[in-house]
């Protein structure tokens, strides 16, 4: 996960939790709801970044296997 994106997701989760808790303690339902929403956005961003990371890892694995196959074919043709 890109560091800036990871920090942004974490910031949203923490900020959301603070707002949610503050809203609960003060009885401010709007602030509590805003905090829950912000926290969920942070979790969604984190999930999206995890998917991006896994897709990138998979693409690297496929490229590596492809290159290994090409090298193997070249090696066989050289004999």
From Swiss-Prot:
Belongs to the UPF0337 (CsbD) family. InterPro entries: CsbD (IPR008462), YjbJ_sf (IPR036629). Gene3D superfamilies: YjbJ (1.10.1470.10). It holds the Pfam family CsbD. Coiled coil: none annotated. Residues 1-30 are annotated as: Disordered. This is UPF0337 protein YhjA. It comes from the Bacteria.
